[in-house]
């Protein structure tokens, strides 16, 4: 590749395995699970020329404190969560808010979210498009079902839409000390 070119390759484990072991790949950056990160570290251990950056195990929280501008926090949370329809490892997937502003932030997030309608990604006004595939949509609803089984409370539930892998966005909440 020409100097200064960044290539982003997304895919499953077989693609990652080939990239991490290929001698012409001089840098690997990965965001995801500890298990996969461990495999990447092991695969690149004997390649001292290769730079490796691993961001492992996080759930990409937005932390909102009492002195926050709640309108800006709402915009940034929704952008972080819904950019690329939330289909990236770094998508904001949880919000931690102090007790003093939690209810007001929840209200703002819910009011903003119900106004967001998934649409054609080629539409200039599109904020959220479809999921990548029907199987991604099935997995999405499986994860929501699992979240409810683990105690998450649906504040706004997603519903499937017609015309592709579209779903309405959702917010689930968990109260208490442990997010």
How should these model regions be labeled?
Residues 1-16:
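PLP-dependent aminotransferase-like
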């Amino acid at each position: 590749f020409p100097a200064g070119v960044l290539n982003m390759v997304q895919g499953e484990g077989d693609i990652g395995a080939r990239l991490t072991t290929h001698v012409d790949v001089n840098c690997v950056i990965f965001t995801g699970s500890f298990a996969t990160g461990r495999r990447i570290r092991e695969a690149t251990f004997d390649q001292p020329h290769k730079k490796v950056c691993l961001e492992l195990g996080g759930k990409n929280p937005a932390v909102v404190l009492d002195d926050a501008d709640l309108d800006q926090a709402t915009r940034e949370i929704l952008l972080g969560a819904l950019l690329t329809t939330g289909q990236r490892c770094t998508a904001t997937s949880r919000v931690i808010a102090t007790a003093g502003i939690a209810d007001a932030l929840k209200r703002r997030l819910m009011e903003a979210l119900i106004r967001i309608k998934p649409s054609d990604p080629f539409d200039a006004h599109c904020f959220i498009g479809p999921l990548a595939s029907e199987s991604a949509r099935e997995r999405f609803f499986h994860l929501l079902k699992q979240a409810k089984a683990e105690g998450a409370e649906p504040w706004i539930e997603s519903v499937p839409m017609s015309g592709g892998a579209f779903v309405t966005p959702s917010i689930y909440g968990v109260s208490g000390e442990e997010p």
